[in-house]
Amino acid sequence: MPELPEVATVITELKSCVLNKPVKQVKVHLDKVLKNTNVKQLNDALVNHSFVDIKRRGKYIIFCLSNGLFLVSHLRMEGKYFFEAKGSQFDLNHVLVEFLFQDGDQLNYHDTRQFGTFHLFNRYQFENARELNKLALDPLDQEFNHQAIFNKGHKSNKKIKTFILDQTNISGIGNIYADEILFASKIHPETLAKNLNLSQYQLICQNATDILKKAVEMKGTTIGTFTFKKDHTGGYQHFLKIHGKKGKQCQSCNTTIIKKKINGRGSYICEKCQIQR
């Protein structure tokens, strides 16, 4: 699943090619991706209007329309956007939504797993959307701070990895970066959140910010299928210290890295650097 750095990278790419282009038509090839609207309503909202800005909240992509409406997209497991210039040849296999622009260009939403979602909101609905309002701050928000995370964590019986994956505690972090953050912090992912002290939360939060910033600079992590445009992959996979390295030696202590399931998530651990407490 694309995490914060991947979503941020997608948005940067989208802003470079689709802003201020009036929409001619929207074609939807799988109705279930539209969660609170339908094809007619979507066309009524978008045709003759343009995307004037694209923002992020957690892992959500927010298309801001020239008429004041908002189209909110979540990529889920395998969602991707591909921009196609006028006259280009492309395959519509796995394309669920086509945004056709009046200048002949188009933006395709591609999703092999078909888990992605779209919500159409007016301003009132957007400001009161449960999907968005339940999200916590993410590590790149200016107001993100370890004291607030500690205040939640010291009351929680969840394992710390499960705790930081919960988007109502910290948004934007997924499985890959959770492993990297906890390894950098030398904290075992099965340690209970309530058993960590304030300084450990400070370490988690600082590492989260540093790692996600670096991953954004590297245009995300490509493990599997992530691309931010056709034939362009991220680069942070070359900087991963622990995720995906089962059976390899820890770069810090040469201990063999193990993999185990924690609440259904494959988790990579150095049992010497990350002692369970």
Swiss-Prot record:
GO molecular function: 8-oxo-7,8-dihydroguanine DNA N-glycosylase activity; class I DNA-(apurinic or apyrimidinic site) endonuclease activity; damaged DNA binding; zinc ion binding
Keywords: DNA damage, DNA repair, DNA-binding, Glycosidase, Hydrolase, Lyase, Metal-binding, Multifunctional enzyme, Zinc, Zinc-finger
Superkingdom of source: Bacteria
Cofactor(s) needed: Zn(2+)
Lineage: Bacteria, Bacillati, Mycoplasmatota, Mycoplasmoidales, Mycoplasmoidaceae
Gene Ontology biological process: base-excision repair
Catalysed reactions, as listed in the record: Hydrolysis of DNA containing ring-opened 7-methylguanine residues, releasing 2,6-diamino-4-hydroxy-5-(N-methyl)formamidopyrimidine; 2'-deoxyribonucleotide-(2'-deoxyribose 5'-phosphate)-2'-deoxyribonucleotide-DNA = a 3'-end 2'-deoxyribonucleotide-(2,3-dehydro-2,3-deoxyribose 5'-phosphate)-DNA + a 5'-end 5'-phospho-2'-deoxyribonucleoside-DNA + H(+)
Record's cofactor remark: Binds 1 zinc ion per subunit.
Organism whose genome encodes this protein: Mycoplasma pneumoniae (strain ATCC 29342 / M129 / Subtype 1)
Full protein name: Formamidopyrimidine-DNA glycosylase
HAMAP family: Fapy_DNA_glycosyl (MF_00103)
